[in-house]
Amino acid sequence: EYIEVLINNAGIRKDNLMLWMTGEEWSKVLDISLNGFFNVTQPLLKNMLVKRYGRIVNIVSLSGIQGMPGQTNYSAAKGGVIAATKALAQEVAKKKVTVNAVAPGFIRTDMTEGIDENEWKKHIPVGRFGTPEEVADLVGFLASPASSYITGEVISINGGLYT
């Protein structure tokens, strides 16, 4: 028995302008996202490679692609996972293990609680925040055998924001 599909979906925000960011705010965010990716993924890789099948999907963020003011730590952490996704995909592709990332934009979750949706949806071409179900559908596809020719990709799901 082994784990065929791994979804790395850890992340916290400790938003602050870098000028006033504490070392703890920086370290905590990077530890959860970037070190979390390593600490969960690395022990599971060997069995995926031996069995010659695996799907790894990393949940990142538009902040990791675009960078957002007040989120230098979060942007760096998610950007690091994006780079690791691309590198690891090249390491394991020949063993039929795919590694991809999903970069949600504004999705109605605890992470966007407190953000003024009416203000932000003016900037989103589809005119609304996304739903967790829409993200789950994309992740489900990437976790399936149907996605066997997709690896090392970062797929944005953001209603057309920052494309």
Q: For each of these PLM feature ranges, what is it?
A:
Residues 46, 90-94, 148:
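Alpha-helical segment proximal to the catalytic Tyr-Lys
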Residues 116-134:
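Catalytic Tyr-x(3-8)-Lys segment
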Residues 17-18, 25-30, 56, 112, ...:
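Substrate-binding pocket helix/loop in short-chain dehydrogenase/reductase
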Residues 61:
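Residue(s) in the substrate-gating loop at a strand-loop-helix junction
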Residues 41, 77, 85:
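Active-site helix of classical SDR
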Residues 45, 53, 129-157, 161-162:
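C-terminal substrate-recognition "lid" of short-chain dehydrogenase/reductases
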